[in-house]
Amino acid sequence: MAKIGLFFGSNTGKTRKVAKSIKKRFDDETMSDAVNVNRVSAEDFAQYQFLILGTPTLGEGELPGLSSDCENESWEEFLPKIEGLDFSGKTVALFGLGDQVGYPENFLDAMGELHSFFTERGAKVVGAWSTDGYEFEGSTAVVDGKFVGLALDLDNQSGKTDERVAAWLAQIAPEFGLSL
C-alpha cells in the first residue's frame, strides 16, 4: 500500500487535474492514485497515515456537493461518513482552488472547512502557505496570517500553479518523511 493517500473533491475537473499533477511527482509506493472522495470508502480513506486532500470552493464559500449544484457527490456527502473517525497521529496537507477576483470575500473557504474538520478530529495539518501574491478580502482558510494549505487560483493566476505546487510539495515532503 502507498504511504500517502491523495484524495480530492471536484466539480469542473480542475481540482482533479491538480491532484493528478501532484501524483505525477511520486511513485506508486509513495502515493496512491488521485481518487475522488465520491469513489472511496471511509475504511479505505482511514487506512492512510498521511493524506493530501484537495477541494475547490464553490459559490459563496461552499464545499463541493449536491447542495452546491454539483452533478455528483463530493466532500459535502463524504465528511459525514468519516466524522466519527479519530485522525490523531495522522498528518494532513490541504490544497484548495478558488477565485479570488470573483469571490474575494470567501476565497478558499472550503479549504478552511476541511482544515476545521480534520483538526477537530486530531489530525496534524501541515503545509501552511503565505498569503503574499493574492488579493482577496476574506477567507476562513487563513489562520495566523497564512493559508492553511496550498492556495491556487486557476481562474486568475493559472500561470503560477506549477511553481506553487512544486514549492508546496518541497515544503511538506519532510512532514511525510520524504525528500524531493
UniProtKB/Swiss-Prot annotation:
Record-linked InterPro entries: Flavdoxin-like (IPR001094), Flavodoxin (IPR050619), Flavodoxin/NO_synth (IPR008254), Flavodoxin_CS (IPR001226), Flavodoxin_lc (IPR010086), Flavoprotein-like_sf (IPR029039)
PROSITE patterns: FLAVODOXIN, FLAVODOXIN_LIKE
Assigned keywords, A-Z: Electron transport, Flavoprotein, FMN, Nitrogen fixation, Transport
Residue ranges of domain Flavodoxin-like in the record: 4-173
UniProt keyword Nuclease present: no
GO biological process: nitrogen fixation
Gene Ontology MF terms: electron transfer activity; FMN binding; oxidoreductase activity, acting on NAD(P)H, quinone or similar compound as acceptor
Cofactor(s) the protein needs: FMN
UniProt keyword annotation of Electron transport present: yes
Family: Belongs to the flavodoxin family.
Function: Low-potential electron donor to a number of redox enzymes. NifF is the electron donor to nitrogenase.
Protein name per Swiss-Prot or TrEMBL: Flavodoxin B
Organism: Azotobacter chroococcum mcd 1
